[in-house]
């Protein structure tokens, strides 16, 4: 079994996933648009080039997402996408990038369980936890 996060966006999925691919050193494996749907399916006006389904491979994890047209889009709440990073320097770098233009919920710092841990909500409204565990 595998559990994968699926993120929703109000029309910014392409920008968000392109950004995440760069920050997380991932590979975009799918980026399907609404205008690629079979004929006869309803596509909201102006949403043809918006993302119907995206997949980003990061290590052995797949993050999926799409643009969700109004009134169905809901701002993310009640969860965090958690990233485990091997080195404090890499954790700081990823946290800084995800925080740029967003809101820092908990600054990245040493905690009793981690060399580095921080929580931020990025400029796309996705909540992230960045963690670099203590060894030993």
Give the positions of each predicted feature:
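Short, acidic (Asp/Glu-rich) active-site segment that either coordinates a divalent metal cofactor
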Residues: 79
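Vicinal oxygen chelate
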Residues: 3, 29-32, 43, 50, ...
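Core segments of cupin and vicinal oxygen chelate
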Residues: 7-60
């Amino acid at each position: 079994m595998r559990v994968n996060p699926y993120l929703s966006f109000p029309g910014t999925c392409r920008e968000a996933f392109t950004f995440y691919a760069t920050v997380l050193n991932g590979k975009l494996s799918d980026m399907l648009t609404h205008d690629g749907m079979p004929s006869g399916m309803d596509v909201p006006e102006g949403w043809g080039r918006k993302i119907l389904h995206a997949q980003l491979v990061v290590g052995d994890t797949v993050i999926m997402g799409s643009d969700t047209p109004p009134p169905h889009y809901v701002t993310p709440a009640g969860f965090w996408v958690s990233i485990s990073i091997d080195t404090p320097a890499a954790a700081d770098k990823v946290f800084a990038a995800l925080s740029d233009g967003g809101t820092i919920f908990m600054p990245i710092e040493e905690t009793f369980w981690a060399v580095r841990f921080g929580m931020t909500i990025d400029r796309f409204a996705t909540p992230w936890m960045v963690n670099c565990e203590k060894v030993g």
